[in-house]
Amino acid sequence: WGPVMLILLVGTGVYLTFRFGFLTWRNLFPSLKALFSKESRIKKDGGKGDVSPFAALMTALASTIGTGNIVGVATAMIAGGPGALVWMWISAAFGITTKFAECALSIKYRVVNDRGEMLGGPMYSIKAAFHDKLPGKILAVLFAIFALLASFGIGNLTQANSISDAVNSTFTIPTWVTGLILTVMVLIIVLGGIQSISKVSSVLVPAMAVFYIVAGLVVIFGNISGIPEGLRNIFVMAFSGKSVAGGIAGTLTATMMNSMRYGVGRGVFSNEAGMGSAAIAAAAAHTDNHIRQGYINMCGTFLDTIVVCTITGLAIASSGVLGTTNAAMDGTYVIDNNKITIASHNIGSDSSYKDTIYEYALTDDGFSLTDDSGNVTNYTPCTKEKIATNQETDFDKKMDGVEAKATETTLQGTWQDESGNNVKFSTDGQYESLTLTTGAKLTIEAFRSVLGDVGAYLVTIGLILFAFSTILGWEYNGEKALEFLAKKPLVCYIYRIIFSLVVYFG
């Protein structure tokens, strides 16, 4: 997710938005109205396709609304600061147009296989754009190969692993049991093809989205007093030098790029605008107008990022679990019982430095700093990546042989050890080993701030549903990519079985 990829993803969306005269923005709400209308749920006479326009979008959303909406948002706000949410919104605003274009093209250039099923996606659009010449064929094959590989990785193993870990940590059910049940459920559904997947998605996706949105709104309004400060942090840190994970402020350009990188990256991971995957499911829609279906499918980016991801982001920001100044200083920490190594340096009368490595461990009666002989020491600690909160202390890095300097004073702040764990120094000289809460755990802490332990269960259930729907959606994407390469029905049936079995290994 470097500058080149950011320019390609966001830049393409910006170009198309201006090129289309902001049509996608102006037609967003009419498109949402059309999406939720009765007409979008039926297959009209005169068109062709496998499923209704609504079912096609729900199948596409099944693959896009996943762990990124819960884990990805939290990770972006930790790594890129709260301001990463702003860049998610910006990328989604222009990603709407990208999604419109790729889905409309997919329907325009779709074909019908021997079984009367629709086949579409970027591989077909690319071939048409190059007039079926060799460069287009090569690019189309490459896209299909990468989509097929992604179906097993991001669309299968990653999601299955998230489900089994969540079920094990919350309900203490062995991972192999979860894997077995999940494998059987996926196999039963995907063997029915697009009809079965779309029927399940049409019920599961709206239900799980409403479930999560309602729970998130309860958390947000339960922390209503924290909303102003949370919003302030989100917008200020999107353009400030205090949004780098670890809490160290850098140059404005560097930290903005970091916030932008994580915001755009996690946003695309969540809504898949520009990746082309949603266009594969869009091609199955029963319609005679590719522009109309393009408008309907672009609503997926709005619902995924502007709605669901925003719920997660505001729940985290308003609850205060992320912190009020930066992502690592005042965040939510948990005690880490593992030993950590720090370097201590004694300033004597001759201003000499003692560079002995000590181990600091938690004890039953509190905390202690001991040397390698087991003696309690009073040396002033110095570790990597100093963060001072109240007093100015002159520390340089000492780890890895870099000279350290110190002034004798009471310390208050947060440092990191060799492994990157946070070490917090309090005013009374106590030392605590603290690990920053990240990912799904951070979202759980946000929900727990209002709903208690029930909040943890709700996030876990949401994570399970989101990940399960992603598996179903990506099975269809991978199958159609394989059909483009192999063009034999038997291969697709074999893929369905193999895909389902791979779920167990996740």
Residue ranges and their predicted role:
Residues K384-T414:
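N-terminal helix-cap/turn-to-beta initiation motif at the start of protein domains
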Residues I42-M77, L105-A129, I145-L148, A249-F302:
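Alpha-helical membrane segments and immediately flanking helix-loop junctions
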Residues L8-L32, A160-V167, P174-V236:
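Membrane-interface loop-to-helix entry segments
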Residues L16-T17, S91-G116, K127-N161, D165-I189, ...:
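Helix-loop-helix module between adjacent transmembrane segments
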Residues W1-S63, T67, M77-A84, G95:
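N-terminal alpha-helical transmembrane segments of multi-pass membrane transport
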Residues T324-D355, E359-Y360, D396-D400, T409, ...:
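N-terminal glycine/threonine-rich, aromatic-flanked beta-hairpin/loop signature
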Residues E102-R110, A215-F235, V244-T251, A285, ...:
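Extracellular/periplasmic helix-exit of transmembrane alpha-helices
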Residues L6-G11, K137-I145, S169-I194, V210-F211, ...:
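Transmembrane alpha-helical segments of multi-pass small-molecule transport proteins
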